[in-house]
C-alpha cells in the first residue's frame, strides 16, 4: 500500500523511501526467537527511470498481518508455512498464530535466511520508532504508525541524467535476463 505514495515523487525524478512500523502491535518473531516483537515493518522505495519507474513495496516479514487475519477469518490455510507456532514449529495454519501459546510470523527469509529479514526489520524499527522518540517502550495502545519518509534528489549527488542512465541500465539488464 505504501507504493501509492511514491509515484508523484518518482515522476519528478526524486527517490522516495518510506518506512513504517506500528509500535502498538507485535506479530513478528526475531530470528532465532519465538515471541512477537515487532510488526512486518514495510518499506517502499521509488526508483525513477526514463522507460518505467521501479516501485518497490515489501514487508520485512514472510507475510503480513492482514494476510494472517484474512486467511484465518476465511478458515483457510496460508500458501506456505509462514507461522511459527508457540512451540517453535512452522505452520501454514493461521489458527496457530492465535493459539495459546501464541504463534508469530516468521521474518522475511523464514528459518533458513530469516536473519536477513530480521536485520531489515530492526533497521525499520530504528528509523521509525526510535528516531521519532515514540515506540514499543512506551506501550502505546491503538493504531499509531511510526513513519520515516526520506526523499533523495539525484541532482544533488552524481546528477539526474547519470542516475537515470544507471537505473535504466540495471532495469534493462533485469528485463533481458534469461528466464
Descriptions of predicted regions:
Residues 76-136:
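Secondary-shell segments that build the walls of catalytic and ion/ligand-binding clefts
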Residues 126, 137-179:
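Catalytic-core signal marking the mid-to-C-terminal active-site face
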Residues 1-3, 28:
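Short glycine/serine/threonine-rich phosphate/pyrophosphate-binding segments
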Residues 6-8:
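N-terminal intrinsically disordered, cationic/polar leader segments
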Residues 26-98:
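Phosphate/diphosphate-binding glycine-rich loops and adjacent basic-rich segments that engage nucleotide
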Amino acid at each position: 500500500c505504501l507504493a501509492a505514495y511514491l509515484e508523484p515523487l518518482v515522476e519528478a525524478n526524486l527517490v522516495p523511501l518510506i518506512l513504517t512500523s506500528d509500535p502498538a502491535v507485535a506479530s513478528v518473531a526475531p530470528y532465532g526467537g519465538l515471541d512477537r516483537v515487532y510488526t512486518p515493518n514495510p518499506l517502499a522505495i521509488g526508483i525513477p527511470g526514463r522507460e518505467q519507474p521501479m516501485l518497490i513495496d515489501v514487508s520485512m516479514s514472510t507475510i503480513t498481518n492482514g494476510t494472517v487475519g484474512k486467511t484465518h477469518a476465511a478458515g483457510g490455510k496460508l500458501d506456505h508455512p509462514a507461522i511459527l507456532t508457540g512451540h517453535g514449529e512452522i505452520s501454514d495454519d493461521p489458527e496457530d498464530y492465535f493459539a495459546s501459546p501464541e504463534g508469530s510470523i516468521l521474518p522475511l527469509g523464514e528459518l533458513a535466511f530469516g536473519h536477513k529479514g530480521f536485520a531489515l526489520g530492526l533497521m525499520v524499527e530504528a528509523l521509525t520508532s526510535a528516531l521519532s522518540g515514540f515506540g514499543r517502550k512506551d506501550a502505546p495502545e491503538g493504531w499509531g504508525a511510526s513513519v520515516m519518509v526520506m526523499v533523495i534528489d539525484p541532482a544533488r549527488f552524481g546528477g539526474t541524467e547519470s542516475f537515470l542512465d544507471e537505473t535504466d541500465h540495471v532495469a534493462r539488464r533485469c528485463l533481458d535476463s534469461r528466464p
